[in-house]
């Protein structure tokens, strides 16, 4: 290992990435083994921290400057991270980050285009460690989740409807009408 190389625990970095709906595959130029992820010096790690909008101090004890400009940060259309979510061969979502800031790393706002409907097999996520509020901005959305008795629940949300989901509740959103495209805004926090 080079003297300049910085190591961050792999599980810790994966947890940070999960708050951004990302995986190690979404980072370029990082090496890793079973337990560590290696960065080519502090500048490399700072660039990754800035890209994720997560304070450098979340990676290790240190200081980071605010990414706000006079108390605000603006994210422009098509300027943020975007990825496709494929579950078991089914194209479920296109995730697009809304504004992220290192001043509130536990907050993740996403715009999602829904691609699946009842024609594809149901694929719930495994739940996640954050609370979630979802608002339907376009279309009609079928939401499914696992209830308290491990029973599959479902409902339909129309444009303007919203839902709150506790941490670790497996859930999924699909288009309610086959062939129609829906859009949701998801706010994950805490």
UniProtKB/Swiss-Prot annotation:
Q: Domain of life, per the record? A: Bacteria
Q: Which positions fall inside the Cupin type-2 domain?
A: 128-176
Q: Which Gene3D superfamilies match?
A: Jelly Rolls
The annotated pathway is:
Antibiotic biosynthesis; fosfomycin biosynthesis
Q: What does the entry's cofactor note say about binding and number?
A: Binds 1 Fe(2+) ion per subunit.
The record lists Fe cation as bound by 128, 132, 171
Q: Which terms are listed as keywords in the entry?
A: Antibiotic biosynthesis, Dioxygenase, DNA-binding, Iron, Metal-binding, NAD, Oxidoreductase
E.C. number:
1.11.1.23
In the record, biological process GO terms are: antibiotic biosynthetic process
> What GO molecular function annotations does the UniProt record carry, in alphabetical order?
dioxygenase activity; DNA binding; metal ion binding
List the catalysed reactions.
(S)-2-hydroxypropylphosphonate + H2O2 = (1R,2S)-epoxypropylphosphonate + 2 H2O
Per the record, DNA-binding region residues lie at: 20-40
Give the HTH cro/C1-type domain ranges: 10-60
Pfam family of the protein (one): Cupin_2
Query: Does the keyword section mention Ribosomal protein?
Result: no
Q: Which residues bind substrate?
A: 87, 95, 125-128, 132
| InterPro entries (UniProt xref) | Cupin_2, RmlC-like_jellyroll, RmlC_Cupin_sf
Q: Which cofactor does it need?
A: Fe(2+)
What protein family does this chain belong to? Belongs to the non-heme iron-dependent dioxygenase family.
Q: Describe its partners and assembly state.
A: Homotrimer.
Q: What does this protein do?
A: Non-heme-dependent dioxygenase that catalyzes the oxidative epoxidation of (S)-2-hydroxypropylphosphonate into (1R,2S)-epoxypropylphosphonate, the final step in the biosynthesis of fosfomycin antibiotic.
What name does the UniProt record give this protein? (S)-2-hydroxypropylphosphonic acid epoxidase
- Specify the species: Pseudomonas syringae
Q: Which gene encodes it?
A: hppE
């Amino acid at each position: 290992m080079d003297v300049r190389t910085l190591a961050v625990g792999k599980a810790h970095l994966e947890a940070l990435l999960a708050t951004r709906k990302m995986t190690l595959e979404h980072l370029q130029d990082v090496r890793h083994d079973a337990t560590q992820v290696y960065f080519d010096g502090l500048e490399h790690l700072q660039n990754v921290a800035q890209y994720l909008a997560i304070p450098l101090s979340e990676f290790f004890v240190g200081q980071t400057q605010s990414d706000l400009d006079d108390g605000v940060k603006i994210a422009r259309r098509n300027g943020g991270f975007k990825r496709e979510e494929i579950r078991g061969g089914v194209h479920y979502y296109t995730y697009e980050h809304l504004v992220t800031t290192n001043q509130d790393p536990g907050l993740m706002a996403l715009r999602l285009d829904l691609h699946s409907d009842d024609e594809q097999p149901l694929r719930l996520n495994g739940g996640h460690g954050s609370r979630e509020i979802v608002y339907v901005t376009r279309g009609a959305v079928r939401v499914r989740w696992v209830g308290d008795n491990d029973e599959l629940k479902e409902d339909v949300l129309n444009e303007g409807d919203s839902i709150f989901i506790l941490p670790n509740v497996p859930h999924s959103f699909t288009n309610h009408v086959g062939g129609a495209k829906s859009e949701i805004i998801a706010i994950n926090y805490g």
